[in-house]
């Protein structure tokens, strides 16, 4: 326990919990304090002035990060016939219809993102209790219900990140790896923040973006001055 406390204190050193850092400085602090023995993910948290309990204040969408996420994304596609073949050629990890339904319905989730052609949704919709809580239910609003399965697979593999506001009004997302250079992380963060701003619901009143912070997987959060991520209401 003493070793853990010492490590945590070392990570926290030099980070003022009450200060808003400009984005470039915050990225530097996060990278300097990423001491895990693996390539940690850099994550962003945005506190929004919305109440997601109301349907007209839901914030969700998808954004293609210019420098990818650094993750290997496993993609499942529900499709038949030619569309199934297109998905396979595009690099989908798992492709199927009824047989894939049975696998997923049995609780075996060996993928990170799920895509479906429109004709498959009556079947896929029955997996709501399995895919819904994991945020994997295909949705046309984020491009995962589509006839262009090849493009959807390519986007998923190439850096597409879905976002959805949580109950407390917070959006979390991984936007790169500690091994990325600072400029690439900054570009990804600004691209992500811009997408969240553009997804602002018309019913949201007052201050939309309340707080922004970034961290690494095992690190502490560093508060970011929203104006430095081009966040303007």
From Swiss-Prot:
Part of the 50S ribosomal subunit. This is Large ribosomal subunit protein uL1. The keyword rRNA-binding applies. One of its GO terms (biological process) is regulation of translation. It comes from Brucella suis (strain ATCC 23445 / NCTC 10510). Belongs to the universal ribosomal protein uL1 family. The keyword Metal-binding does not apply. The gene is rplA. Keywords: Repressor, Ribonucleoprotein, Ribosomal protein, RNA-binding, rRNA-binding, Translation regulation, tRNA-binding. HAMAP family: Ribosomal_uL1_B. InterPro entries: Ribosom_uL1_bac-type, Ribosomal_uL1, Ribosomal_uL1-like, Ribosomal_uL1/biogenesis, Ribosomal_uL1_3-a/b-sand, Ribosomal_uL1_CS.
């Amino acid at each position: 326990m003493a070793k853990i406390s010492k490590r945590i204190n070392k990570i926290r050193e030099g980070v003022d919990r009450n200060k808003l850092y400009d984005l470039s400085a915050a990225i530097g602090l996060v990278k300097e304090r990423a001491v895990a023995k693996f390539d940690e993910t850099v994550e962003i948290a945005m506190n929004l002035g919305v109440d997601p309990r109301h349907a007209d204040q839901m914030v969700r969408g998808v954004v293609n990060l210019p420098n990818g996420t650094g993750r290997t994304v496993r993609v499942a596609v529900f499709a038949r016939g030619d569309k199934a073949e297109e998905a396979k050629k595009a690099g989908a990890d798992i492709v199927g219809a009824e047989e894939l339904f049975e696998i997923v319905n049995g609780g075996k989730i060996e993928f990170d993102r799920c895509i479906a052609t429109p004709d498959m949704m009556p079947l896929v919709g029955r997996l709501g209790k399995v895919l819904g809580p994991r945020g994997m239910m295909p949705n046309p609003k984020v491009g995962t219900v589509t006839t262009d399965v090849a493009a959807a697979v390519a986007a998923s593999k190439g850096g597409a990140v879905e976002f959805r506001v949580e109950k407390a009004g917070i959006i979390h997302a991984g936007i790169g790896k500690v091994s990325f250079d600072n400029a690439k992380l900054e570009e990804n963060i600004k691209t992500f923040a811009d997408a969240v701003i553009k997804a602002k619901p018309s019913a949201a009143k007052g201050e939309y973006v309340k707080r922004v912070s970034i961290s690494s997987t095992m690190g502490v959060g560093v508060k970011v001055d929203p104006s430095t991520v081009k966040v303007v209401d």
